[in-house]
Amino acid sequence: RVPEKYRNRAPRTITLPNGGDALLIEGQPLREANFLDLRAGRATGQWQPFGLRVEGAAGIGSPEQRIREQDEDGLDGEVLFPAQVAGPSLWRNITHNDVYKSMIRAYNDWLGEEYCPTDPERLIGMGIIPWTNVDDAVEELEHIAKLGLKGVVLGAHPNGKSFPLPEDDRFWAAAVDMNMPV
């Protein structure tokens, strides 16, 4: 999903010498898989924070795995959004805005076109808004709505800064017009 010209810069999971996984993101030190807090399905004494593998871990696998785990936990469905610590806040450290925005778009497309359609009543996806500027935020909001995702996660103000500006009103108005929860 990431454009070919940016694939070598895309975040990815790599295997460490200890056999565990780590997340490799441009501009960031390696983050071992313990960033996911993979405690789901394990008693406290069984959890080991290092040498963990992402593949097959409870709570983060395929949509089919997610549905099985919902059944095991007695859940009718769940709202899906990325953990800020392991996703959008780290991706923002990618300094080239076009590369960064392509990561956001790839995630939203994957969630809306592949993952949630497996069972849209039980896998309720929330798209991610880029932290760049209001134009980009509104454009991605419109794209997320077309994908059929049910809302958006916003880790910064629509203007991309940590403080609000009057220009943010365009984003809020668009979200209201689209009946899109933020």
Describe every region a protein language model picked out:
Residues 1-182:
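Helix-coil boundary/capping segments in enzymes
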